[in-house]
Amino acid sequence: HTGGPFSSLDFTYVLYNDFLKYDPDDDQWFDRDRFVLSPGHESALLYSMMCLIGWLDIKDLKEFRQLGSKTPGHPERGLTPGVECTTGPLGQGVANAVGMAVSEAILRNQFSEDIVSHYTYLLHSDGDIQEPVAQGAIALAGHWGLSRLIGYYDANKAQIAGKVSRSDTTDYKMFYESNNWHVQEVDGQDREAIRSAIRIAQMEIEKPSIIIGHNVIAPGCATMEGNHNTHGAP
């Protein structure tokens, strides 16, 4: 699955480089920010970040999708340092992230912001948002006003069998707004726009936030940019 990691790269890089709060010496630090990669098939992107932090090494990347490695095809909680939850089934990670944001809100209210104060960041794909489990979780997050939840929608308009428009023409900006989310739209390859959008989302105190990153699959790949076949091709 090469195309998706390319289109999700700019957001993920900006998040880890400029915003995500974590301890490189302790991946289980209790007040770390959480990041959930809902499209688990984009695991190569996540493992690359783990390698740059130092939680994985080049040898682990070379063993990608090999039996017994720390870098399976889909991220597994408890196997790979820095993986917050096991993802793969589309939509599941969205619900996982909402659950983490609920936990943060409960603990923050119980123990105060001096002890618990972190964000839950979510990245989801076109396929994730089409799943009922994701849509139900999104509705719940908006209803409860989980303002420490910040999502990024990698809208690259491609799925493994073809263009998204073949099967779905939902207006997801309107969908999110109708579920009480703060919505921003950016160019998914514009890192400064992404930085600005995350800063604005962090200032929102009444609603969860979603940043819709308009993109194409496999951006920058000279012969394959925009080609849905990169979704599942090596």
Q: Where are each of the predicted segments found?
A:
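Cofactor-binding active-site loop characterized by glycine-rich and histidine/acidic residues
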Residues: 5-144
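Short secondary-structure boundary/capping segments
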Residues: 52-53, 136-139, 165-170, 201, ...
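Conserved thiamine diphosphate
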Residues: 108-116, 164-197
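A short, conserved beta-to-alpha structural element at the edge of catalytic cores
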Residues: 141-168
